[in-house]
Curated annotation (Swiss-Prot):
Name recorded for this polypeptide: Isopentenyl-diphosphate delta-isomerase
EC number(s) stated in the UniProt entry for this protein: 5.3.3.2
Subunit structure and binding partners: Homooctamer. Dimer of tetramers.
Cofactor names: FMN; NADPH; Mg(2+)
Gene that this polypeptide is encoded by: fni
Family to which the UniProt record says this protein belongs: Belongs to the IPP isomerase type 2 family.
One Gene Ontology term of the molecular function aspect: oxidoreductase activity
Keyword Plastid among UniProt keywords: no
Chief location: cytoplasm
Taxonomic source organism: Rickettsia typhi (strain ATCC VR-144 / Wilmington)
Length: 342
C-alpha cells in the first residue's frame, strides 16, 4: 500500500513537471479559430455597462470562467492550488481541483486540496476519476471528498485514453454507467462529468444525461494531450511509442460543443480544451457553452505567484469584454446570439 501511495505522489509530481517544461499540446487544434465574429463598428454600447456575470451551481460569478482541474497531492501542488484559489476568489470565477483519489489512501494530503478558507465564495469542484468506481471507490467516499473541501459539486472525470497510456493505469471500464448513476443519486451536490482532453461525443452525452447528469465539461482535443505527457513519462521504447501514437486523437472542442448542444438545450456545458484567451471563450459561448475553462497558462503562472494568475485572469476577462463590445453584445445572452461568418 505504501509503495502504491508513493507511486501516486511521484506520478503527480511527474505530471506537474512535464506540463510545465515540455510541449504536450495535442497536434489537433480546438477548432475555435474557424469561428469568425462579424465585427460591429457601431455597437452603441458603453464599455462600462458590459455585463459578464453569470451563475453556476447556484453561485454568482463575475465572469463565465473555470480554472480547470490540474493538480493536488504534493507539496508543489499545495502551493499551486492555493494561488489558483486566491486568484479565483479575487476574480470571482470557479475552480476545479485535481484528482483527489490520493486523499482516500493518504489522508495527510488533505492540505494540498484545502482552499475553501481562501476562496469562500467561488464555485469549487472536487474531483476523482470515474473509473475508480470500478476499483472500490464508493458513493460514500465521494461524499467524503465533497465534505472535506466543502465543494459545490463533484467532477467524475473520464480519462480512458490517459489510463491506457500509463503503465499503472486502470483498464476496467465495464459497467461504469450504473455506478455513475449511483453516485449521482447518493450525493448532496451535482455531479459534473468531464473528459480530460479528448472530447465527449453525442452518444456518450445522451447516456450521461439519461442517468441524471446535468453538467458536462467537454474538455476536447486542442489543449493538453495526456498521452503525450505519458510519452515523456515512459520508461521504455514500447510505452513511449504507444503513447506518442495518440497525440492527434480525439474530438475537437468545437465539434464536441456543437454535438452536445444539439443533444440538449438545457444541460450546462463547460467548454475546455485548447482555449487560450477570452476571445476563444467568447467563441465557445457563442457556440453554446455556458462557461469556459482554461488550465495550461494558469498552471505556469500559479507555479510562480498568485499575482501572475490574477493578471492572466484579468487579461482573459478584458479580452472577453472587448470581444463583447466589438460584437454589440452587452450580456452573455447577447454574445450567445452574436453574428458570425457562415
Amino acid at each position: 500500500m505504501l509503495e502504491e501511495q508513493n507511486s501516486d505522489i511521484e506520478r503527480k509530481q511527474d505530471h506537474i513537471e512535464i506540463n510545465l517544461k515540455q510541449n504536450v499540446n495535442s497536434t489537433l487544434k480546438s477548432g475555435l479559430a474557424s469561428i469568425k465574429f462579424i465585427h460591429n463598428a457601431l455597437p452603441e454600447i458603453n464599455y462600462d455597462n458590459i455585463d459578464t456575470t453569470t451563475t453556476f451551481l447556484g453561485k454568482y460569478m463575475k465572469a463565465p470562467i473555470l480554472i480547470s482541474s490540474m493538480t493536488g497531492g504534493t507539496t508543489r501542488a499545495k502551493d499551486i492550488n492555493y494561488r489558483l484559489a486566491q486568484a479565483a476568489q479575487k476574480s470571482g470565477i470557479a475552480m476545479g481541483l485535481g484528482s483527489m483519489r490520493i486523499l482516500l489512501t493518504k489522508p495527510d494530503t488533505i492540505k494540498t486540496f484545502t482552499v475553501r478558507h481562501v476562496a469562500p465564495d467561488i464555485p469549487l469542484l472536487a474531483n476523482i476519476g470515474a473509473v475508480q468506481l470500478n476499483y472500490g471507490v464508493t458513493p460514500k467516499e465521494c461524499q467524503y471528498l465533497i465534505d472535506t473541501i466543502k465543494a459545490d459539486a463533484l467532477i467524475l472525470h473520464l480519462n480512458v485514453l490517459h489510463e491506457l497510456t500509463q503503465p499503472e493505469g486502470n483498464r476496467n471500464w465495464e459497467n461504469l454507467l450504473p455506478k455513475i448513476k449511483e453516485v449521482i443519486n447518493y450525493l448532496s451536490v451535482p455531479v459534473i462529468i468531464k473528459e480530460v482532453g479528448y472530447g465527449l461525443s453525442k452518444q456518450v452525452a445522451k447516456k450521461l444525461i439519461k442517468v441524471g447528469v446535468k453538467v458536462l465539461d467537454i474538455a476536447g482535443s486542442g489543449g493538453t494531450s495526456w498521452s503525450q505527457v505519458e510519452a515523456y513519462r515512459a520508461k521504455n521504447s514500447m510505452q513511449n511509442r504507444i503513447a506518442s501514437s495518440f497525440i492527434n486523437w480525439g474530438i475537437t472542442t468545437l465539434d464536441s460543443l456543437k454535438m452536445l448542444r444539439e443533444v440538449s438545450k438545457d444541460i450546462t456545458l463547460i467548454a475546455s480544451g485548447g482555449l487560450q484567451s477570452g476571445i476563444d471563450g467568447a467563441k465557445a459561448i457563442r457556440m453554446g457553452a455556458n462557461i469556459f475553462g482554461l488550465a495550461g497558462q494558469l498552471l505556469k503562472a500559479a507555479d510562480i505567484a498568485e499575482s501572475l494568475v490574477s493578471e492572466e485572469i484579468q487579461l482573459i476577462i478584458e479580452q472577453l469584454k472587448i470581444t463583447m463590445l466589438c460584437t454589440g453584445s452587452c450580456t452573455l445572452k447577447d454574445l450567445a446570439k452574436a453574428e458570425i461568418m457562415l
